Amino acid sequence: MKKIKKVFAVLLLMLLVAAPVVTAATQPVAVEAAAKTKTKLKKVKGKYYAYEKGKKVCNKWRTIKVGKKKYRFYFDKKGRAYQANKAAMGKTGVLVKKIKGKYYGFDYQGHMVKGLRGGSTSAYSMPNLYFFNSKGVYDKKKTVMYRNAAKTNSNAAQIKKLLGKYKKVSVTGESCFGDGNGSDVVYVYDNIELSVFRPTGKDASAEIVESVSQRY
């Protein structure tokens, strides 16, 4: 019996020696992350283009760092960024474009915008108010709400409430609006200007909307 146990022990030892050793110190596998393609923004004759590896970016969205901030751009089939006409729309007006079934607004520098803006679908069409959500998508419900409150001859209280705190206000002399018995007042916000008629006398608080437009 002792001899059998001894033989068994020897066989077990041989198996242990022959078995491969697996430890935490296995040979490391090098994993190299794919290099991120660098996008370069260039301005040519007033138009913005994006290049990657020397080729124009076309029919695509890109987020590009300009200065210390990052902005969203969309480049059309010719590689041109959608952008508003500064001469017609000013610095805050936007060009409204449809991309894959959704509408977005772009300023004169090609930046996609958010929030309330004055804009139009072309440089020569009549501007109107547009509201874009946190993702830059046109919000029809909020847009209608702002447009209804901003109708000419309506009480200015509602649109002023929606617009919130203004940056500055200016009051002119006699107005030509309505019966002319009052003053023209312009409230300036970040991207919007609200023009109202302020009656004289006891009705001075009952301002009337003249117009709402993008801030030039």
Where is each model-derived feature located?
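Extracellular adhesion/carbohydrate-binding repeat motifs centered on closely spaced tryptophans
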Residues: 5-216
